[in-house]
Curated annotation (Swiss-Prot):
Cofactor: Mg(2+); Mn(2+); Ca(2+)
Annotated site location: Interaction with DNA: 466, 469, 636-637, 689, 729
Name by which UniProt lists this protein: DNA topoisomerase 2
Keyword presence, Disulfide bond: no
Entry's family note: Belongs to the type II topoisomerase family.
Recorded catalytic activity of this chain's protein: ATP-dependent breakage, passage and rejoining of double-stranded DNA
Composition bias, Gly residues: 1175-1184
Source species of the chain: Trypanosoma cruzi
Length: 1232
């Protein structure tokens, strides 16, 4: 019966309430990037906003009901009015045909009652109808009703007026009221509703600022779709005379203020389409609307609109080819934003959410010649012509020796790393091949493994590290890349030349030979990218010019000494599953240097077996652009999100002899991208990156906790944890994990012994790894209890078990220490928080508070910080340093933001000194404290805000996190850290349950063993067991008869004891141990998992508080005994801002107070500096702005200089006047 109780049948209303995402999309607020209107700039801007798509959808349903009425021929519609109150109640009203106020003959209900209060009621079920409306399924307005606290409707049609209200999520309603009104009064439909904001995870009766902007934009889109209708929001109409007016709002100026050409707009009966140019290339964006429905996920109409632009650009490309110009259409596309607003009959969407159009659209017939002429006029077109001519290209060609044949002697002297083919003669039986290897060790393998005959036609050239990404043809960067220059020179390539045949080159094939790991895939990709970007025709017309040489990644040796080679881990894992009972030894080849010369000779003996020919199609440059172009961030994010979500193994089919670019990108290059993200981005639960996790695991498994030299420790960690990325990077990570200065780690998992860096350079001033020592910190062992280790999931590398997939510390370490990382398409910047506050947050969640509530109280903090954290104007956090400003112009700086190094602060002050803002600096700072005296020019600062800004004493702290979730999925958090708290809470609590169960099992097994031992000892002492004359078998039978438990299938735990074990003292000890074990079992049974957690949190809190007190005391002790004193300037001294109110849960749950509080945002006081005539924006208007401190000082100096000049002039005039007055009386009268 218990199983049967799990099955439930819900009412349709309850189903909507329990599973709203099925009908209206997600009801969780998440960060989404979209266009919104910026009132200050007067145009659309692309911003990341906190959007609740479910709330947007229920408002949209009523808006679309109103807009659908436009197509109703029963009466002309003139307006749609939307009003949103401060209390969050929304009213949408429209005139027009109106809803018939009659009872349905079939259902005996009024039509408005059915339309707004009964699911699956609609007038749009006739699929033969030619009306272009948004409604289709009969859910629409009813979903809004169900997801609202209250919902009312007023309909006036043909002299009758209908009123009805619903509440309790459409479960209860008032009786419909129908009255007669003046038939001359206009028809109307008015819907008023109050959404259930708490159901959408929002504050009660409150629409956020971001959601107001999103709704404003949504209503604006509707106004653009129907410019003949007056559509207004809160009494303010959107006055679009045409679609072109709306499209102009998407035009944005360049960084220099220059405006792009006006958009290309075409309107027809089927809708409107606009191509909006931008002077700077960006991510391709398309915004589509169908019958008023915003299709957030695009669809067939967006694809068709892009195809219109693409085909027109191809026509432009053909026209320019006549002038020997080859245009890169893919890059030109990035200069355009596309709007497509369609009017469609019977459109079909992917779901009730209507986020994507799936039916074939009827597109406006855009005049192609007009569009082509428009494209040819674009000012940025010339910048994307694929030519590399010019002085710089000529210089590079000259440096590389391009365009002339070079002798082997010249090549040897100019390219020392090149081992050239021994003959220059051509032989049709052999393809002259240049092998490009990853590093010198791979070069040695190739060179030592090639036969004498192969060396006649095969050269070898090693590459060091990562190649330059030349996707955007940045020849200035290429000029500084010696490796690529030498590679091009070895091949005889010339920049700017179009190659039709590889026979024009010194080598007819480039064989790329790299390690079989993610970094090797990246190097292959960069080589392909370089040649496709600079010489696309060479690859298009010569399939296989670039070929990939593959070597085994795993070799298996069976008992019969036969071997199997596997070229991918996917292939090896598949073999393992089908040969589970086979005994074998596996050797992993992570690098080419692992292969012996004998193995290398085996590879090159049959080169064709190991070689795949790369085939490059004409349109493959689009995909390579998306991967390597720095501006295609959003594409890479989407690519990584899909790749990370895929749970299977992806790899190239090495049995095929050809490789396409899409296969290489999606099946091999993707491994580098995924590995790059795994290395750079932290795990949400333990806050660690793989290298940090390997270090922690390896150090914790060492016997004892003796200090070890960092350089030696890195070698040990590499060996035991299968680390493959160089010991230098490992040493840097070890050093960073031990740094404990303010702004380093709030919790340093390793102890620093030596110079591990300081606030002077934020840790970059550490000593070399061979001079410094470290060991595990005591806090690390508290955070990562040893009892957890048997319960964790571990990673297997090279056939051995290494570190856990992720740890589950007692606190979310990600929040304690923060995390910064730049991955492939994703980046993360999570600030640190006070560990005791994180502990308080966890305690609050244990007490029943929601993570969303708790996380709002967390404030970024660095242990030892002596400043304060404020709220910024946009809701962000601001770290503010502290200072004393004295009336004589002296400033004593005692703290700077923890994200700023003391050296960087000094450099900034030096710049101000060069502008005469600062007259003197005296730095008394140490490793972990700030103590700096400044003398400022009189009048340079007039308010405390100017002082903080000019002296760089404030830094904004933004939260932009991307982490790996507990299931390993890459998850962007944007500014919301609540998921981190929740994921950690769930995993840690689950671990305590498992640990409690395991410990109970161990204690009960121990008790059973002790009781069995007691039985045996008691029987022995009573003379019932004769050990002297017994055999091993008879003793085992005796133990079995006594009901003793077996341990490891034997009774050795009692039979192998010394004779002293059977003494009276031992018996007493055994009874005492049994009593203690029983007490431990009883105590553990009474201890809930959360209590186990609280006990360990108590232990951590005590230890950390002692650690923090010591750190702070050290900082205060290092300060000067006699700091500066004097009268403080009231105008320039920092104010003590009020603390923000603490947000507590309204749904119960006891809040645990936190130590760090954020101070309220207060607008800075107005500047008292004089205007110095700097014009605003470079345009007209002749305005002026308050100047910087440097400009004010310069202005004051100029004024003083001018005043001195005027004084001198006045003095000279006075002297002359006195002399003239003395001489005049003595002159003869006739002179006058």
């Amino acid at each position: 019966m218990a199983e049967a109780s799990k099955y439930k049948k819900l009412t349709p209303i309850d189903h909507v309430l329990i599973r709203p995402e099925m009908y209206v999309g997600s009801v969780d607020t998440s960060s989404s990037s979209m266009f919104v209107f910026d009132h200050e700039k007067g145009r659309m801007v692309w911003e990341s906003l906190k959007v609740n798509h479910g709330l947007l959808k229920i408002v949209d349903e009523i808006l679309l009901n109103a807009s659908d009425n436009i197509a109703n021929k029963g009466g002309r519609m003139t307006y749609i009015r939307v009003h949103i109150t401060e209390a969050g109640e929304i009213t949408i009203e429209n005139d027009g045909a109106g809803i018939p106020i009659v009872r349905s003959k079939e259902h005996k209900l009024y039509i408005p009652e059915m339309v707004f209060g009964h699911l699956l009621t609609s007038s749009n079920y006739d699929d033969t109808s030619q009306n272009a409306v948004a409604g289709r399924h009969g859910y629409g307005a009813k979903l809004t009703n169900i997801l609202s606290h209250r919902f009312s409707v007023c309909c006036r049609t043909k002299g009758k007026e209908f009123h009805m209200s619903w509440h309790d999520h459409m479960r209860r309603a008032t009786a419909p009221r129908v009255s007669n009104v003046d038939p001359k009064e206009k028809n109307l439909t008015r819907v008023k509703f109050l959404p259930d904001y708490e159901r959408f995870g929002l504050d009660a009766n409150k629409i956020s600022h971001d959601m107001k902007r999103v709704l404003h934009k949504r209503i604006m889109d509707l106004a653009a779709m129907f410019p003949s209708i007056e559509i207004s929001l809160n009494g303010v109409p959107f006055a679009f005379k045409s679609f072109a007016d709306y499209a102009m709002l998407y035009s944005s100026p360049s960084s220099s203020g220059e405006m792009p050409p006006a958009p290309f707009v075409y309107e027809s009966r089927n809708g409107a389409i606009a191509f909006i140019p931008s002077l700077t290339a960006g991510t391709r964006r398309i915004f589509g609307v169908v019958n008023g429905v915003v299709t957030h996920n695009g669809g067939t109409h967006c694809n068709a609109a892009q195809e219109v632009l693409q085909s027109s650009l191809e026509s432009v490309e053909k026209a320019l080819k006549k002038d020997n110009k080859v245009i890169d259409t893919n890059r030109v596309l990035r200069h355009f934003m596309i709007l497509v607003f369609l009017v469609q009959v019977q459109p079909k969407f992917d779901s009730q959410n209507k986020a994507r159009l799936v039916s074939v659209p009827t597109m406006p017939r855009v005049p192609r010649q007009e569009l082509m002429d428009f494209l040819l006029r674009m000012p940025f077109l010339e910048a994307h012509v694929n030519t590399v001519t010019g002085q710089l290209a000529d210089e590079l060609n000259k440096e590389m020796g391009a365009g002339r044949r070079m002798s082997s002697k010249s090549l040897i002297s100019s390219i020392t790393k090149l081992v050239d083919a021994t003959t220059t003669r051509r032989d049709p039986r052999f393809v002259r091949t240049l092998i490009v290897t990853e590093g010198d060790s791979a070069k040695a393998l190739a060179q030592n493994s090639l036969s004498s005959d192969q060396k006649r036609y095969t050269g070898v050239f090693p590459l060091r590290g990562k190649l330059l990404n030349v996707r955007n043809k940045n020849l200035k960067r290429l000029k500084n890349c010696k490796e690529l220059q030498e590679l091009f020179c070895a091949l005889g390539l010339e920049l700017g030349k179009i190659y039709k045949d590889a026979e024009e080159l010194r080598y007819q094939r480039l064989l790329v030979m790299t390690d079989q790991d993610a970094d090797g895939s990246h190097i292959k990709g960069l080589v392909i990218n370089a040649f496709e970007a600079l010489w696309p025709s060479l690859l298009n017309r010569n399939p296989g010019f670039i070929s990939i040489f593959s070597t085994p990644i795993v070799k298996v040796r069976l008992r019969d000494k036969s071997t199997h080679s596997f070229f991918s881990l996917k292939e090896f894992h598949k073999w393992q599953k089908t040969h589970g009972n086979v005994s074998y030894t596996a050797k992993y080849y992570k690098a080419l240097g692992t292969s012996t010369t004998a193995e290398g000779k085996e590879y090159f003996k049959d080169m064709d077996k190991h070689t795949m020919r790369l085939v490059v199609e004409r349109n493959d440059h689009k995909l390579l652009d998306s991967v390597f172009d720095s501006q295609e961030v959003e594409w890479r994010k989407d690519w990584m999100t899909k790749a990370n979500a895929y749970t299977g193994e992806v790899d190239i089919d090495r049995s095929k002899k050809t490789l396409t670019v899409p296969d290489f990108v999606h099946k091999e290059m993707v491994h580098f991208a995924l590995a790059g993200n795994a290395r750079a981005l932290a795990h949400a639960v333990d806050g660690l990156k793989p290298s940090q996790r390997k270090i922690l695991w390896a150090i914790m498994r060492r016997s004892g906790n003796e200090s070890a030299k960092v350089a030696q420790l890195s070698g040990y960690i590499s060996e035991v944890s299968a680390f493959h990325h160089g010991e230098m990077s490992l040493q840097e990570t070890i050093i960073k994990m031990a740094q404990n200065f303010t702004g380093g780690n709030n919790i340093n998992l390793l102890i620093p012994e030596g110079q591990f860096g300081s606030r002077q350079q934020l840790g970059n001033d550490h000593a070399a790894a061979r001079y410094i020592f470290t060991k595990l910190s005591s806090l690390a062992r508290i955070l990562f209890p040893s009892e957890d280790e048997p319960l964790l999931d571990y990673v297997t590398e090279e056939g051995q078990q290494v570190e856990p997939n992720h740890y589950v510390p007692i606190l979310p370490l990600l929040l304690c220490n923060g995390s910064v990382g730049i991955g492939f398409g994703f980046a993360s910047n999570i600030p640190p928080f006070h560990p005791l506050d994180v502990s308080a947050a966890v305690r609050s969640m244990i007490n029943g508070e929601a993570a969303k509530v708790v996380v709002r109280r967390l404030v970024p903090w660095a242990v030892g910080y002596q400043g304060e954290v404020r709220r910024g104007p946009e809701g962000e956090f601001i770290a503010a340093g502290s200072y004393q400003y004295y009336v004589d112009g002296r400033v004593h700086v005692t703290e700077i933001p923890w994200t700023l190094s003391i050296e960087a602060f000094r450099d900034h002050i030096s710049v101000l000194a060069s502008k005469d803002v600062v007259q003197r600096i005296a730095d008394y700072s140490g490793a972990n404290h700030v103590d700096i005296d400044l003398e400022l020019t009189n009048g340079a600062m007039t308010t405390y805000a100017e002082c903080e800004s000019e002296l760089s004493l404030t830094q904004r702290i933004y939260i932009n996190g991307t982490v790996f979730s507990p299931t390993g999925v890459l998850t962007p958090l944007e500014g919301d850290l609540a998921p981190v708290l929740q994921w950690h809470y769930d995993r840690r609590l689950d671990l305590y349950k498992k640990r409690r169960q395991r410990n109970l099992g161990l204690l009960e097994a121990e008790l059973a063993r002790e009781k069995s031992t007691l039985k045996f000892v008691t029987h022995f002492r009573e003379g019932k067991i004769d050990i002297v004359n017994a055999t091993d078998d008879s003793l085992a039978k005796t133990c079995s008869k006594l009901g003793m438990v077996r341990v490891d299938d034997s009774y050795d735990y009692v039979l192998r004891k010394p004779i002293t074990f059977y003494t009276k003292t031992s018996l007493e000890n055994l009874n005492r141990k049994i009593s203690e074990t029983e007490k431990r079992i009883d105590k553990l049974k009474k201890t809930a998992p959360v209590q186990m957690w609280l006990d360990e949190l108590d232990r951590f809190d005590r230890a950390f508080e002692e650690h923090e007190n010591t750190a702070v005391a050290t900082i205060l002790k290092e300060r000067r005994v006699n700091p500066p004193t004097g009268d403080v300037s009231r105008n320039l001294q920092q104010p003590r801002l009020e603390l923000e109110e603490v947000k507590v849960s309204s749904s119960g749950g006891k809040s645990v107070p936190m130590r760090v509080r954020v101070r309220k945002y207060v607008p800075p006081p107005p500047s008292k500096r004089p205007h110095v005539g700097q014009s605003v924006g470079g345009g007209g208007g002749g305005g002026s702005v308050r100047s910087s401190a440097a400009a004010v000082v310069a202005h004051v100096k100029a004024e003083k200089k001018a005043a001195r000049a005027r004084s001198m002039q006045k003095m000279l005039l006075d002297v002359v006047a006195r002399q003239v007055a003395r001489v005049l009386p003595r002159l003869p009268w006739f002179l006058f």
